[in-house]
Regions:
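Catalytic domains of lipid- and phosphate-ester/thioester hydrolases
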Residues: 1-189
Length: 189
């Protein structure tokens, strides 16, 4: 930092799982903490956020944001809108994501379980992911560039916050963390 300037806080964010509710609250809390957001007239939970959010910081102060499940989605959406301060980050998460998923289960997966047709198209998880991507894209955000591509603003400069998104492997139940950071040696696992 330049001599005589204010210290820059180093912030780590952890976001718990809990589905779309965790994603929504993650974006609301981060929107409240980051000072480059314009909250004029924004009342996501029935209150004026400018009266609630009094201490703001720069998004670049957040070094690493880690989450699991819905918390990971909230962090990814937040990063997708990092440079779009006019859009409340939680806006894309207020859409109907259950409808397309239920339709896929009811009209493709369930009949296929009985008649063993080779159903083409996406499975329910892919339908849900595509609906998240579409919702963010409709709000002028970007979830589709690729996870690692968004970590670098230029080939020589990381774009903060770095994300460490966790999940569980369906094959063995072990935790899986995806990040642009090298968090452990592959041989240590």
């Amino acid at each position: 930092r330049p001599a005589g300037s204010e210290p820059i806080p180093l912030v780590f964010v952890a976001s718990a799982g809990g589905g779309i509710r965790a994603a929504y609250w993650t974006t609301i809390v981060l929107n409240c903490l980051v000072k480059n957001q314009d909250n004029a007239g924004w009342k996501p939970i029935g209150m004026d956020m400018n009266n609630v959010c009094t201490h703001r910081m720069s998004m670049d102060s957040v070094f690493l944001a880690s989450g699991i499940s819905g918390g990971s989605l909230g962090l990814a959406v937040t990063k997708a809108f990092k440079d779009a301060p006019a859009v409340p980050w939680s806006e894309p998460l207020g859409k109907d994501f259950l409808g397309p998923t239920v339709a896929g289960v009811a009209f493709r997966d369930l009949p296929n379980a009985f008649v063993r047709l080779r159903a083409t198209g996406q499975d329910s998880a892919a339908v849900l992911e595509k609906s998240w991507e579409k919702s963010v894209r409709d709000a002028k955000g970007d979830l589709e560039s690729g996870f690692l591509a968004t970590a670098w603003s230029t080939p020589a400069r990381l774009d903060f916050p770095l994300l460490a998104l966790s999940g569980t492997s369906v094959t063995d139940g072990c935790r899986v963390t995806v990040s642009a950071l090298k968090l452990a040696d592959a041989d240590a696992a």
